[in-house]
Design a protein with these regions (language model features):
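Feature responds to low-complexity, polar/acidic, surface-exposed segments characteristic
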Residues: 1-13, 17-42, 49-70, 78-102, ...
Length: 194
């Protein structure tokens, strides 16, 4: 799965593109470093045309560059069309930072949190496991731990995400298609769909 690998800008675009309900979007933005044949081209250009992602300047996107926690918070907030609903204080996030509002938005919605030392680490790269965890929270998805425990052999597994990994349930939720029902916001899996 690459749980501890840094998430790239292209990967984030593809993930959010896959979540779009309406993919029929007029492409109004293209980047010089995103070739038409690239696996992520449609995702990048669509999300850029919707104003969800932005380039790095000079008509470039830097698709292979690792994405920071601040960048991801900004993209997630724009994707969800969410705005800041609270106030949170971090030692390294200031009102004049470009990412101030998106970080506070993501935190106020409970999608992402800071660290015990009172920092957010906005410029730190974000991992695939962290992105999966945040995205599941955005979508109000959570794995049914009882189902997971009773069906380990049937689940799509990854050697770098053992049952003891902090993101095991998060990853299982994201990669294993399943039928489910919800009661009081708690997801109960009824079976795998593959």
């Amino acid at each position: 799965f690459g749980a501890n690998d840094n998430m790239t800008r292209a990967q984030v675009c593809q993930m959010f593109y896959n979540l779009l309900l309406d993919k029929d979007v007029a492409i109004t933005v293209n980047f010089a470093d995103v070739s038409d044949g690239a696996w992520y081209a449609k995702a990048v250009n669509t999300l850029a045309s919707l104003g969800i992602v932005k380039g790095i300047g000079d008509g470039m996107f830097a698709p292979d560059r690792a994405i920071s926690r601040a960048e991801f918070a900004a993209i997630a907030s724009r994707f969800a069309k969410a705005s800041n609903v609270g106030s949170v204080s971090f030692a390294d996030v200031f009102a004049d930072d470009w990412f101030y509002d998106p970080v506070l938005t993501a935190v106020s919605y409970g999608w992402i949190s800071g660290y015990e030392d009172g920092t957010f680490k906005p410029n730190a790269n974000i991992t695939r496991a962290e992105v999966t965890s945040i995205t599941n929270r955005m979508l109000a998805r959570a794995a049914d731990t009882n189902f997971l425990a009773g069906n380990v052999a049937a689940l799509k597994q990854f050697s770098d995400v053992p049952v003891t990994h902090w993101a095991y349930g998060v990853v299982m939720e994201a990669v294993n298609g399943h039928d489910h029902s919800k009661t009081d916001g708690v997801e109960s899996w009824n079976g795998l769909t593959r």
